[in-house]
């Protein structure tokens, strides 16, 4: 896996939602180390807690992002950070074809602003030498490659090296479309 998670690491899933990726991370960690699942919505974290219990994942801590203090307390603490950022969802149109009719330019503009803020803020959780994956289920370059390029040009982003990225297109793979970029924090 791109994030290269191992047992004993400190890992943060910043946009955990109902926790599919969190549970995968817990499995890779073999219940060893600290895995923090964060989300804006308490209801999603409650779902994740139930799923984690059913799956035997016991190394997960749950944190609601209700203030900036939640993020600040974690600054430079994690070996690995996953940012599965909010996005337009244009990579999953195959499963949700009506979504394209609901998307407005204002929504795309707003989501790009949210992505920039999330990347700027949550990247500070990565400790020097640690790695971050920025991911979306979008196929728009403005939400993906361009977003990463913009971040790397910021003061915070200058502390990171771009390692590699990957773009999956539904038309080529048969899977949902998505994007992932691997960044490493400079020591």
What are these regions (language model features)?
Residues 1-187:
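S-adenosylmethionine
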């Amino acid at each position: 896996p791109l994030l290269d998670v191992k047992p004993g690491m400190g890992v943060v899933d910043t946009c955990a939602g109902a926790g599919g990726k969190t549970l995968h991370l817990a499995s890779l960690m073999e219940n060893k180390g600290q895995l923090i699942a964060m989300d804006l919505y308490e209801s999603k974290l409650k779902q994740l807690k139930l799923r984690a219990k059913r799956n035997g994942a016991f190394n997960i801590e749950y944190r609601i992002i209700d203030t900036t203090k939640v993020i600040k307390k974690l600054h430079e603490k994690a070996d690995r950070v996953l940012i599965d950022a909010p996005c337009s969802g244009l990579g999953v149109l195959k499963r949700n074809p009506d979504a394209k009719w609901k998307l407005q330019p204002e929504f795309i503009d707003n989501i790009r602003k949210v992505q920039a803020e999330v990347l700027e803020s949550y990247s500070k959780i990565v400790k020097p030498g640690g790695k971050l994956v920025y991911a979306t289920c979008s196929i728009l370059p403005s939400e993906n490659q361009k977003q990463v390029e913009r971040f790397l040009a910021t003061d915070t982003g200058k502390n990171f090296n771009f390692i590699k990225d990957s773009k999956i297109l539904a038309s080529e793979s048969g899977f949902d479309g998505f994007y992932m970029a691997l960044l490493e924090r400079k020591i």
